[in-house]
Amino acid sequence: MRDPIETVMNLVPMVVEQTNRGERAYDIFSRLLKERIIFVNGPVEDGMSMLVCAQLLFLEAENPKKEINMYINSPGGVVTSGMAIYDTMQFIRPPVSTLCMGQAASMGSLLLTAGATGHRYALPNARIMVHQPSGGFQGQASDIERHAQDIIKMKRRLNEIYVKHTGRDYDTIERTLDRDHFMTAQEALEFGLIDKVVEARDVSADESK
């Protein structure tokens, strides 16, 4: 069975622009990158993480002061891959605005709440889900014990990140993340994961630019 993401990428439309040197064709995502828009779409894994981090670093080099917009629709995925994106978002100089369209689950929700304060959004029908990390291991008992200790440390670190970005106390975060916890956009706003639920673009802000 073919990878559905690969199938979709083969159908990515091209955008043709007229320049003083003639016509130039971009795939739609490259054209949006010119507008400082990055998509985090699908499972978070090493390949996606590499591409997102590279785009963040490129946009910082292009303009270290101008805001970057990250659109998220992700079920989550590998913790270390997500942490690479998170650390890069915090490392670069431009503020990163985040917006959830569809869903931001697991690591997707962490990336959503990691956006610049006041610039974390969700569309009205978006779904956000938070939970603790999970994993499965096999091998010697001593190795399994070490893996268990490591995942507990990772759980603690993820809780601390949610505390930092939501303003909630540690015990509340730990209780909330103990099981899969689903939220509507409005509930995510009330919890502190996002700053605003947006139904339409702010036309006045666009016109003032």
From Swiss-Prot:
Q: Has keyword Protease?
A: yes
Q: What is its EC number?
A: 3.4.21.92
Its UniProt entry gives the catalysed reaction(s) as: Hydrolysis of proteins to small peptides in the presence of ATP and magnesium. alpha-casein is the usual test substrate. In the absence of ATP, only oligopeptides shorter than five residues are hydrolyzed (such as succinyl-Leu-Tyr-|-NHMec, and Leu-Tyr-Leu-|-Tyr-Trp, in which cleavage of the -Tyr-|-Leu- and -Tyr-|-Trp bonds also occurs)
What domain of life does the UniProt record list for this protein's source? Bacteria
The keyword Cell inner membrane appears for this protein: no
Q: Which UniProt keywords apply?
A: Cytoplasm, Hydrolase, Protease, Serine protease
Q: PROSITE patterns, from UniProt?
A: CLP_PROTEASE_HIS (PS00382), CLP_PROTEASE_SER (PS00381)
Q: What's a single GO MF annotation on this record? A: ATPase binding
Q: Where is the active site?
A: S106, H131
Q: Which SUPFAM superfamilies match?
A: ClpP/crotonase
Q: Which InterPro entries match?
A: ClpP (IPR001907), ClpP/crotonase-like_dom_sf (IPR029045), ClpP/TepA (IPR023562), ClpP_His_AS (IPR033135), ClpP_Ser_AS (IPR018215)
Could you say which protein family the record assigns here?
Answer: Belongs to the peptidase S14 family.
Function of the protein: Cleaves peptides in various proteins in a process that requires ATP hydrolysis. Has a chymotrypsin-like activity. Plays a major role in the degradation of misfolded proteins.
Q: Spell out the protein name for this chain.
A: ATP-dependent Clp protease proteolytic subunit
Tell me what organism the protein belongs to: Brucella canis (strain ATCC 23365 / NCTC 10854 / RM-666)
